[in-house]
Amino acid sequence: KDLFARYGKLLILAGGSNTVFKDSSFEGCVLRVCNKGIEVLEEDENEIVLRVAAGEVWREFVLWACKKNYCGLENLAAIYGTVGAAPVQNIGAYGAQVADYIEWVESFDMSNGEIKRFYAKDCQFDYRFSRWKKDNKNELICYVAFRLKKAFTPQLSYSAINQSISEEEAKNLTAERMCEIITEI
């Protein structure tokens, strides 16, 4: 709120990797999301729910999860950006989309200073779409909670994946190895 009052315009960047500025192109304050942290909220023998800060690098988070055998996000391992940007676009690749693993998204409403929590059913997820691509430009995503499995079930529906592994390797595939394969493709 204070930044908005001071500068009038705010531009929120995640990593900023797809953004180029000319010196005179934006009159306002550029805010980069840099919060970090991964917290276990729930865990049982089958699943884990993680609260992940929006400023975490997406790829690093996915690799971390795969190394711990927290499964589901493997096919999204090669996507660049941050955790907070992932629900905005409902990122997806190789037969997976992030919406299938999101429990909730927590955001800061810059117009009134409120923290809001949106459960997956309220995020309006669709193909490369969410509520944040529509009318909710005043909301800054702060945290995303993911529900991941502890048993790995590979998603091998894309031919590029099948062509990258042998039948024998497919039988012994791990989440971590799947991340490597996706990154190599």
Predicted regions and their residues:
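Generic preference for hydrophobic/aromatic residues in regular secondary structure cores
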Residues: I38-E39, I102, I141, Y158
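Phosphate/pyrophosphate- and phosphate-bearing ligand-binding catalytic cores of soluble enzymes
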Residues: T19, I115-I185
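Hydrophobic side chains in beta-strands
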Residues: V33, S107, F146-L148
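Anion-binding (especially nucleotide phosphate/pyrophosphate-binding) glycine-rich loop
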Residues: K1-Y101, D109-S111
